[in-house]
Regions:
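Histidine-acidic metal/acid-base catalytic patches
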Residues: 2, 9, 17-20, 53, ...
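Glycine-rich, positively charged N-terminal anion/phosphate-binding segment
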Residues: 39-60
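Aromatic-lined carbohydrate-binding surfaces of glycoside hydrolases
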Residues: 64-72, 103-112
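A short glycine/small-residue-enriched secondary-structure motif
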Residues: 21-25, 56-72
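Glycine-rich, proline-tolerant flexible connector loops at the mouths of alpha/beta enzymes
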Residues: 30-46, 109, 242
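Glycine-rich, histidine-containing beta strand-loop boundary motifs that form or position
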Residues: 31, 61-63, 101-106, 234
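N-terminal ordered "arm"
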Residues: 13-36
């Protein structure tokens, strides 16, 4: 597997030198300074690539080329925006970059309610608490019909919790949910997110899936010409938020997408933490079934709770069989007759250790020490399984 590291560009508090010292050889990055929907000029792509290569690293994966909401809703200027997206793919291919991660989540990107969840060792993790989310949705945002999106016990728990919150606590919760997390697509204020929700709530899951399929059919010719694998990231979390549709939360969702768009350029990002937040997703089975579509992997673990809440645990601890997943992915690589296939992998998120907790530049989930620790643990698993013989564990 190819060890990679998410880098947010020159303003990232983690330098390229630090990434190399952590042992990664590939970089996962994007041109975040270019507004969503505009073409990425080849000269900008080449400059970013050269910056990475000057540090002795390789730009392995683009994460991501974000999708404008007009594309997701097939409205407004979506035809021009799709044309721009096609041109960006052609330019990336010309620069020798052949893996592009993207997502089709409506309104909010990956979402957490607590960015500083304290663990027993005093390190900090990211947490999604369904009751806290319901507090915001029902009592702060006051979305119409919000109570219908939750079980009665969650609604009552949210009511009681909201009554105990002061204004600073409400503001902090709102900021966590709608201000935008690293790599996410922008941020909202309260009026803005309500307007966006209303814009998307015309779609149920199937109608929204058809928009995704239409987008892929539009861009596949360009992706094929550019020799680019479009690797969709699953919904995070893999269930509806704000009553909005979800179209990539389960193995069945992946099957439907592959069947509708069979092009070899239609690939998958296997995010263990996203898919794994649902107990009915078998990550090892998914790696076996979709191995030929998987070109990028986010290795992360979680601890699930019965009401749908979860927190991000250490990489080798939690409810996901990360060792079994890595074994299955190594078996996928071994089946390649050329012997050249190396699936790009990054340690997805990491705990914030004591030494970084006071750093105001820290991006939630993207500490240096926590990710370096995770990468070292994952590397150890890969080396051990390789020494024992690639393939699935008995």
């Amino acid at each position: 597997m190819l060890e990679t590291w998410r880098w947010f560009g020159p303003d990232d508090p983690v330098s390229l030198e630090q990434i190399r010292q952590a042992g990664a050889t590939g970089v996962v990055s994007s041109l975040s300074h270019i507004p969503t929907g505009e073409v990425w000029p080849l000269v900008d792509i080449e400059a970013h690539k050269q910056l990475i290569e000057s540090a002795g690293l390789v730009w392995s994966v683009v994460e991501s080329v974000p999708l404008h909401n007009d594309i997701k809703t097939r409205s407004g200027h979506y035809r021009q925006l799709i044309s721009n997206y096609q041109k960006t793919l052609i330019n990336l291919g010309a620069a020798g970059i052949h893996t592009v991660c993207y997502n089709f989540m409506p309104v909010v990107d990956w979402t957490r309610t607590n960015l500083e969840y304290v663990l027993p060792d005093n390190s900090q993790a990211l947490r999604f608490d369904i009751v806290d989310f319901a507090v915001y949705d029902i009592f702060v945002l006051q979305r119409s019909g919000a109570t219908d999106s939750y079980d009665k016990a969650v609604v009552e728990g949210a009511r009681a919790r909201f009554e105990g919150l002061d204004q600073p606590a409400v503001a902090a919760l709102e900021n966590n949910i709608i201000a935008g997390l690293p790599g996410g697509e922008g941020s909202y204020d309260r009026a803005g997110i309500l307007a966006a929700i209303n814009h998307f709530n015309q779609f149920d899951n199937e109608a929204y899936r058809q928009n995704l399929i239409a987008f892929l059919r539009d861009i596949m010719p360009a992706a094929e010409i550019a020799d680019i694998n479009m690797v969709i990231h699953p919904d995070d979390p893999p269930f509806s938020l704000f009553g909005l549709p979800r179209v990539l939360s389960t193995a069945e969702d992946v099957r439907k997408l592959v069947a509708a768009v069979p092009s070899a350029s239609n690939g998958l990002t296997l995010c263990a933490g996203s898919f794994g937040a649902r107990g009915d997703n078998n990550l090892v089975a998914m790696a076996k079934e979709f191995g030929d579509r998987i070109h990028f992997v986010h290795l992360r673990n979680i601890k699930r709770e019965s009401d749908g809440s979860f927190y991000e645990s250490a990489h080798l601890e939690g409810d996901n069989d990360i060792v079994g997943l890595i074994a299955a992915l190594l078996a996928v690589e071994a089946k390649d007759t050329s012997g050249q296939r190396a699936i790009a992998m990054r340690p997805d998120h990491g705990h914030t250790l004591t030494s970084e907790q006071a750093d105001p530049r820290l991006k939630p989930g993207y500490s240096y020490g926590g990710r370096m620790k995770g990468l070292a643990e994952l590397r150890g698993v890969i080396h051990a399984l390789t020494a024992l013989g690639t393939g699935e564990r008995s």
